[in-house]
Amino acid sequence: MDPSSLSNPQECKVTSLNLVLSVNFEKSQLQGYVEVASQIVKEGTESLILDTNQLEISHCNDVTSNPINFKLSEEHKVFGKALIISIPEGLRSVGKEFIVRVYYNTTVDSNALQWLTKDQTAGKLHPYLFSQCQAIHARSLVPCQDSPSNKVKYQAEITVPKPLTALMSALSTGKTESTDSSVFTFTQEIPIPTYLIAIVVGDLESRVIGPRSKVWSEPSMVAAAEYEFANTEKFIAVGEDLLTPYVWGRYDILLLPPSFPYGGMENPLLTFVTPTLLAGDRSLEGVVAHEIAHSWCGNLVTNKYWSEFFLNEGFTVFVERKILGRLYGEEMFDFEAMNGLKHLHDDVDLFTHKHQEELTALIPNLNGIDPDDAFSSVPYEKGFNLLCYLQSLVGVADFEAWLKSYISKFSYQSIVATQMKDYFIEYFTEKGKSEQISVVNWNDWFNKPGMPIEQVVFVSPAAKVAKDLAEITWIKDQGVNATKDDIKSFKTQQIILFLDTLIHSTSEKPLSVDVLEKMDSLYGFTDVVNSEYKFRWQTLCLHSGLKRIEPKVVEFLISQGRMKFVRPLYRELNKVNPELAKSTFNKYKSQYHIIASKMVAKDLGL
């Protein structure tokens, strides 16, 4: 049983969804029905139970329009309401198919959806809609078994006002037009967990960026996006070489408006990305490598429960860094690993400070907990470090061969960590390496809170140069011998590591305002375009009490809604100027995605 779902796939399993919906921007609603096909897997099952949250259910029919009885459970404050649909007596045997149409509409409180007015878009001409279903928000888009333990095919027929375009995480199969509306049809023939269902409706334009890829965005941003993501096909090709053939057909990218709360979301066929990646020099394209890696890790081999999220994210980070290493030199793998360890350390410290250390276990107990509340770098970086440790025991070539075999074996399935562990042991026992892998303390890796129990040593000369500049030139020597040329030859990742090292190493004893002013006069960090630099520089300045940065922080906070940036920055601003932090959030919270707004409110104690 999935503790994050109220549904019953272990008794009656949904196999496909067919969505027929109209997009109503005046009411901020999707209206229509979903046809749910399911199969009985437990003899005598009387009900199909679906997850819903903030949906209005009108009625249920069978395919011949006969009414079917249903009821909604009491509302659970995290997981919503169960929609309990009666299965006719003749269809309660194992293997029988039960098809029901659920007529419904979404509401303004459906937190999978963000409705933007035309003024909140880049073009200012048309409204915009986008979804974000991970982790447990698909149930506020469509009644479904909203658990990664169950995978479904889906089709859709979406009616939108002209001249807008609809896209989904599915193959576009057609468009028909009438006087004032267009109908777009889609099909997704590969079964996917419901958190990968996605929709966007807006004034969208596309450019071809590869043999199987386009980038989509509002017209004013499409040229910048075309340039920024030009290496997409290279990433896919390396992923295929490392793992298995890419099975999804297309790989398109959608550049979203600034309020999108994540860096990227791996919706199949249509990765969603934040405009904060538009650095102008392709320096932040690693996020695209990450989302491409999800085409295998997460989208094909899926964590069965959200507590085992590292099976999605730890594997994806590992493959992402393998891709970047193969393209840009093997040192890149170690460099990114060292950077990731810093982020992991910060999150472990944060959860420990909040007395939630149990959420730093690789497999935390999420009973009754919204997975969003447990979101951190732990499944990403601690999961990645587990794989690096396993690789160190068996060797790179053999581990990569196992990884390819693992993807082949578990594709199209949802699995638990013990299946991964058992297959690792079985595979390397057959290869004669049982002695090398006998040292793995799986129980502690999976269940012990805190930093990884074994530390792989990562080596990167480029990282050492960046760290030395931070620790010796600036922290030890206070910038006395610093020059403009210090970072002239630095790659983007080195500047990020330099700033991260400063933040991390001065947490107890901040740099003085005079030192930061000198640093800014040499390196010009206050006026950078790159969002990763800006976020770190502003964090550093707030921590040191550089008052003049506060208006710049507010400017950045209201210009985008990526949680990676807004949550820590609001927390830092709240420490030094709580009145400004709270008034800024209260004034602009309606511009943020509902997930981001909820999390920032918690961070600020509102």
Swiss-Prot record:
InterPro entries recorded: Aminopeptidase_N-like_N, Aminopeptidase_N-like_N_sf, ARM-type_fold, LTA4H_cat, M1_LTA-4_hydro/amino_C_sf, M1_LTA4H, Peptidase_M1, Peptidase_M1_C
Enzyme nomenclature, EC number: 3.4.11.-, 3.3.2.10
GO biological process, one term: proteolysis
GO MF terms, alphabetically ordered: aminopeptidase activity; epoxide hydrolase activity; metallopeptidase activity; zinc ion binding
Cofactor binding annotation: Binds 1 zinc ion per subunit.
Catalytic activity: an epoxide + H2O = an ethanediol
Cellular-component GO terms for this entry: cytosol
Swiss-Prot/TrEMBL keywords: Cytoplasm, Hydrolase, Leukotriene biosynthesis, Metal-binding, Metalloprotease, Protease, Zinc
Superkingdom as given in the UniProt entry: Eukaryota
Binding site for a peptide: Q132, C133, Q134, P261, Y262, G263, G264, M265, E266
Residues annotated as catalytic: E291 (proton acceptor), Y380 (proton donor)
UniProt keyword annotation of DNA damage present: no
EC class: hydrolase
Cofactor(s) required, per the database record: Zn(2+)
Subcellular location(s) of the protein: Cytoplasm
Residues annotated as binding Zn(2+): H290, H294, E313
Protein family (similarity comment): Belongs to the peptidase M1 family.
Function (record text): Aminopeptidase that preferentially cleaves di- and tripeptides. Also has low epoxide hydrolase activity (in vitro). Can hydrolyze the epoxide leukotriene LTA(4) but it forms preferentially 5,6-dihydroxy-7,9,11,14-eicosatetraenoic acid rather than the cytokine leukotriene B(4) as the product compared to the homologous mammalian enzyme (in vitro).
The protein's name: Leucine aminopeptidase
Species of provenance: Dictyostelium discoideum (Social amoeba)
